Amino acid sequence: MAEAFLQVLLENLTSFIGDKLVLIFGFEKECEKLSSVFSTIQAVLQDAQEKQLKDKAIENWLQKLNSAAYEVDDILGECKNEAIRFEQSRLGFYHPGIINFRHKIGRRMKEIMEKLDAISEERRKFHFLEKITERQAAAATRETGFVLTEPKVYGRDKEEDEIVKILINNVNVAEELPVFPIIGMGGLGKTTLAQMIFNDERVTKHFNPKIWVCVSDDFDEKRLIKTIIGNIERSSPHVEDLASFQKKLQELLNGKRYLLVLDDVWNDDLEKWAKLRAVLTVGARGASILATTRLEKVGSIMGTLQPYHLSNLSPHDSLLLFMQRAFGQQKEANPNLVAIGKEIVKKCGGVPLAAKTLGGLLRFKREESEWEHVRDNEIWSLPQDESSILPALRLSYHHLPLDLRQCFAYCAVFPKDTKMIKENLITLWMAHGFLLSKGNLELEDVGNEVWNELYLRSFFQEIEAKSGNTYFKIHDLIHDLATSLFSASASCGNIREINVKDYKHTVSIGFAAVVSSYSPSLLKKFVSLRVLNLSYSKLEQLPSSIGDLLHLRYLDLSCNNFRSLPERLCKLQNLQTLDVHNCYSLNCLPKQTSKLSSLRHLVVDGCPLTSTPPRIGLLTCLKTLGFFIVGSKKGYQLGELKNLNLCGSISITHLERVKNDTDAEANLSAKANLQSLSMSWDNDGPNRYESKEVKVLEALKPHPNLKYLEIIAFGGFRFPSWINHSVLEKVISVRIKSCKNCLCLPPFGELPCLENLELQNGSAEVEYVEEDDVHSRFSTRRSFPSLKKLRIWFFRSLKGLMKEEGEEKFPMLEEMAILYCPLFVFPTLSSVKKLEVHGNTNTRGLSSISNLSTLTSLRIGANYRATSLPEEMFTSLTNLEFLSFFDFKNLKDLPTSLTSLNALKRLQIESCDSLESFPEQGLEGLTSLTQLFVKYCKMLKCLPEGLQHLTALTNLGVSGCPEVEKRCDKEIGEDWHKIAHIPNLDIH
């Protein structure tokens, strides 16, 4: 860690010495001496870092060095702040304030020089070797791009097949809930194997639902049950007490052949496990639990089946994995390197994580000497813990370039199993000054490069892109490595980061302290803070003393109860990130927010702000501004955005306040890093003029890099001309809502990358999503070439997608939702698999559903007019597997063509108040049906004939159907003979 921080500090010193403002303070000679001393020490740091693992005295020496380096960094920061104040106030060199500051800093400079002289002298007794750690350039053959998927899994197909067969076949005869533990040391790939099993097609067909829970250290019954419920329902449960959670989970699992994966279990308390297991025993026969753990004791406590001990990879598979990471897609590898690689792989001991890590670090090295150094390095011989491969991983760390080392080690600040957000981590790296400047690159771009390098070297895993962010995790062993790297700075007195958390298993790491609760004295005690995280602290007020934390660069106040923030917060000249998202009572930011001259990220999502702070355009470093509320007064107008180089997403609201197109000059077309843009008008705003709004929206033309576009309540009579293939060439999602005056829709069909289109509450004049190409400047046979999801709401005159059908139109469309469009008629489409239809669709529209012959899922309902459904509706739906009718208030019977759906697996009928009967011939044709659910059909008289012949039917649910429920009484009911063979009955 130390040499990486010194590299940053030396750059800061060099920059400070070269700045003319150093003359104000007269510290040029002192800074040059500091730089010289640090440079001398830096030359031996690599050797010191390696030797500290065996020598406590060296570890203590590094602690002293870290402490001194932090102190120098503080002094430089204070000088920078004073220089800014000097420039702004235009004080003279001999102003008492300047003289006093020079005297105070001069005294501290003298003290730190004495400390460093002692540290430099002490280093001589250790006889360190000078080693220059060079930054390695990537080889020319390095693969470009970065794929968000786990690389190929080697050597686990046999294990996957064996366990899948055990889960599916052996447990069918089990009387008690089967629990199958996978046991193995850390890094063997237990989680990866469990993921393979979880996603195996045989498992998916056999179990429903499938639930995955990462248990980790915290085996809390309430937390686990809540997580399981959330995974099943895809939302957080609205109950709080344990008993309600238990009842809810049992309702969800009752009679279900579910699979529950409990990953990374550490709990060896039999009583805790018994309590959770008791709640889970309500499933159908065949329901199973798969658990992964490092500990034999956990397996013996939990398991009802013989544990599966995961073995090491074979030498062959280990070599394949190592070579894949080391050489990528390179077809021909240097045979000498391959020979050395085979020797390195032997050291990995068949542990996949070690092979991946070492292969990753050699990916960018092609000299034999570099590979031999890895093979022969003495760190291999260090003793290991019970389940640790830290020597191998520590070697990987020491081969990282300097600018990656402390960035990686910093990840130890997060608890194990934390799902981290890449973009947030980069801002924290920036706050601590870990990122070295590179030419004209923004610091965020440098951080992105660092993150990608660490990912390619296998330090990060489980990558997932969602909602504009990249989520990832760190393997437990990698986390152990990062934690071990803080041993040399654990006693450092200069705390740089405070996290207020009440997590039981969160601990202080090095310069990052964790406290259980906030108190005002906290701010007075730690004056050198770079990062302060007060999120979820239930705070209603922030003390004005926050303005005294002059070094603060990252302030997280999210999810608190603030109504306002103190104006003194605006004294934080170094603040880069201010996060107040989801402060639901915060209706204003400080008026002097524009004085936060270093601010780069202002995160305000979920705050009911009534206005944007005035003169926001003065924040020329600003990259993130979640939204902008247009005002009519100077300092609040749209022009404030003109000179901001914004990234990510922005929502611009109250555009009705823009007076004319000149005032609409926000220079959006130059904002190449803006990914998502939302623009909205207030429907109730006064003095709205259609022609003015057309000009305003024309002036808000975005950059061609835009990917997400939303337009809400636009009052113009036509959409802007920039909605075309040349400007929106990269857009993948468009949402248009409540633009009721627009007589036709833009030519969305020509957008080459458009995957998701949502149209809501449009003009009564619109009859087709896309008119003839005669209105378009761009003609193509492949209209909507990439569209996958289409959702249309409340277009009462909409007749269809296009006037003219064609095979080359909508070739990729998979999901459709047509909601409350009564005249809509479906064209012939060959790729649609999922359809949802709501509202009083007319008979022609219902019949046209048969044009979608590839449908596998259909939900249709909220129709209060139809008394019957057309026979031809189902005639060609031979692939349909899921069918749901709901809220048909006047539907009396179902079409006989329903019985032709021989691929149907699940049929749901709900809230059809007038439904009296099933088709006369029953449901005998539904030979694949496994699940039938009928709810709240109060007029239904009986279950269909032939139900007893449906041998695949395993689940029947009936509720809110009084006549049917009587006829299903066990043994005595008139319909009992129809359902007696069904294993899972839920009739109440």
Curated annotation (Swiss-Prot):
Start and stop residues of the LRR repeats: 526-548, 549-572, 574-595, 596-620, 638-662, 674-696, 751-776, 784-808, 829-851, 852-876, 878-900, 901-925, 927-950, 966-988
| Matches recorded under SUPFAM superfamilies | L domain-like, P-loop containing nucleoside triphosphate hydrolases, RNI-like
Organism of this sequence: Solanum bulbocastanum
Q: Know the name of this protein?
A: Putative disease resistance protein RGA4
Q: What is the effect of changing residue 305 to S?
A: In susceptible haplotype
Description of what induces expression? Constitutively expressed.
What else does the entry mention about this protein? Belongs to a four-gene family located at the same locus. Although the four genes are expressed in the resistant haplotype, only RGA2 confers the resistance to P.infestans. In the susceptible haplotype, RGA1 and RGA3 are likely to be pseudogenes created by deletions and mutations, while RGA2 also contains several modifications.
Q: Name one GO biological process term.
A: defense response to other organism
Q: Which residues form the NB-ARC domain?
A: 137-439
Task: List the SMART domains.
Answer: LRR_TYP
What's the encoding gene here? RGA4
| Residues reported to bind ATP | 184-191
Q: Which UniProt keywords apply?
A: ATP-binding, Leucine-rich repeat, Nucleotide-binding, Plant defense, Repeat
**Impact noted for substituting residue 692 to E:** In susceptible haplotype
| Function recorded in the entry | Disease resistance protein. Resistance proteins guard the plant against pathogens that contain an appropriate avirulence protein via a direct or indirect interaction with this avirulence protein. That triggers a defense system which restricts the pathogen growth.
Molecular function, one GO term: ATP binding
Q: Which domain of life is it from?
A: Eukaryota
Give the family this protein belongs to, as stated in its UniProt record: Belongs to the disease resistance NB-LRR family.
Is Phosphoprotein found in the keyword set?
no
PROSITE patterns named among the record's database cross-references: LRR
